Amino acid sequence: MSERTVLIAGASGVIGQSAVQRFAAAGWRVIAVSRRAPDVSADTPFQHLPLDLLDSARCRAAAGEFGGVTHVVYAALYEKPGLYAGWFEQDQMDTNLTMMRNLMEPLIAAATGLRHVSVFQGTKAYGAHVHQIAVPARERSARDPHANFYWLQEDFLRERRARADWSLTIWRPQVVFGGATGVAMNIVPVIGAYAAIQRELGQPLIYPGRPGGVAEAVDADLIADALLWAGEAEAARDETFNITNGDVFTWADTWPAIASALNMEPAFGEPFSLVDYLRQHEGVWDDLVRRQGLRATPLPELLGESHHYADLLFGVNAPADAARAPVLVSTIKLRQAGFGECIDTEEMFAKWLWRLAERKVIPAA
């Protein structure tokens, strides 16, 4: 078999970082496209291409690096500060399409051996952020009639796909958890930083949210394994797949396991905003980072926009009597296609928190 070269766009993000690690471990040549280098283990071989995808001239100039690319994982994402409001704003949608065009147009022209492209959507494809959705949401449902950059990107890729030999796989993951820091939507470092501050203050790990309903999660490493599978699987050609860990959870029921992974006592009280809490305790964080010899990462740099995402997931700003159907998806299609990997969600949280501690991002438990 000829050399397999994967270009991973958004390589420093929660999905991209796991993909870099997994593809490299499987023997692929990896080109990591991101402004920041992915924070992976030191022995992971990859070529970092520090591109700003909003710089079309720079993307065109990099075309010489794209010739040998056989696979693309497009996991790049633009989010506005504060996160949620931007999901409804046309300029944010247009920016995400522009980023994809700037990279993919010169890449498709240069990569004559391109075989497969994976791209990410999510449960917002079903309208989960604007209305109740069917339980479970299935890939065969009609396109939900709301404005979304997912549709702009999908239509762009399908139009290019119609004139080419490569195939396309669209992924709709549930809430993704992984090891990336400073990103828009990964609350693992948010929980880790909050827990470290609470321990520093001699307090238990108080659950900050409302009781909430049944939810699903997906491990970034599991997604990376699915990307590896899809890159070679005939059953993944030109298909759309939901993907989850395989179980369900509630935040309140999972909180004791999260506390245990951090060697802390769980506690429950009234909901409060982690955005506000973390802003108020930046000085405590700075002090414990210095004293415990952690990476010198200011709290805003560690969190990105993910503390806003945490408030959303924990239902902090939801009305106390809010009653909505759970956002659950079917993964039958993916399993029937041949990918059946799963992980216990409580074990997933423990794994990622421990890894952050190993990297000295948060204190050891």
Model-derived segments and spans:
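NAD(P)H-binding glycine-rich loop region in Rossmannoid oxidoreductase-like domains
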Residues: 38-42, 46-98
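Conserved beta-loop-beta element that borders a ligand/cofactor-binding pocket
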Residues: 121, 156-185
